[in-house]
Amino acid sequence: MSMQITRQMLSAGAAMLGFGSVSSGSRAAFTLPPLPYPYDRNEPAIDTQTMRLHHDAHHANYVNNLNQALAAAGGGWASRPLLHILANLDGIPESVRAAVRSNGGGHANHSMFWDVMGGKGGRPAGELAEAIARDLGGFENLQNAFNNAGLKIGGSGWVFVTVDKAGKLALATRPNQETPLTEGGRVLFGNDVWEHAYYLKYQNRRADYLKAWWSVLNWDRIAARYAAAKAGALAI
């Protein structure tokens, strides 16, 4: 995949998700991205009802609340790309900064979440598999460390695999709707361990949810995100 094609693909994806391009400065409001596959695509690991509620209600609330907070912020913040907003939170008025941080993070995290699912699981291949072996001890070690990290989160949060421009991978966790994007990081993929992501099917069995989630990852899409990150073109 050429760098030019990767940039075009990620730019188109960002526009579809309502982010705008990183350099754009004119957008009226953020919008809820359409789910890129049917609601039942991730059955049986993630049930259809959970997908509907998670996308149509929970994610939609983050988008709506983000737009309200940015409108209250003034100063042209509502027209700026999400990546720019999250990387420059110190410039947001203190009265709405926490709301922008939480809801902007929720919008970014969930948009990434939908993007990396809808697949058939399996194993990564090629350059991505090599990077996982180099930086994270191999696929099985990654799965174990990732799942254990998810179990250790007290309350709500996310488990991420982050990637830098050199292609180096790292495991990270964040509480609530925090995101590495606020620190200049980039997310390759991540899992939502808020109860709304799994409780209808798994109740308190978070471990079962974490294990099942790997079966719906789209490794082709994640590999494309990896290539884009190395090209400096992964927006969210």
Feature roles, as predicted:
Residues 45, 57, 68-165, 170-171:
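All-alpha RGS (Regulator of G-protein Signaling) helical domain and cognate RGS-like helical scaffolds
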Residues 2-26:
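N-terminal export signals
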Residues 52-63:
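Structured secondary-structure scaffolds
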Residues 21, 115-124, 201-206:
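Short helix-capping/linker segments at secondary-structure and domain boundaries
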Residues 21-46:
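C-terminal segment of N-terminal export signals and the immediately downstream linker at the start
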Residues 208-236:
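N-terminal targeting pre-sequences for secretion and organelle import
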Residues 148-205, 211-220:
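An amphipathic alpha-helical core segment
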Residues 34, 55, 173:
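Pocket-edge structural micro-motifs
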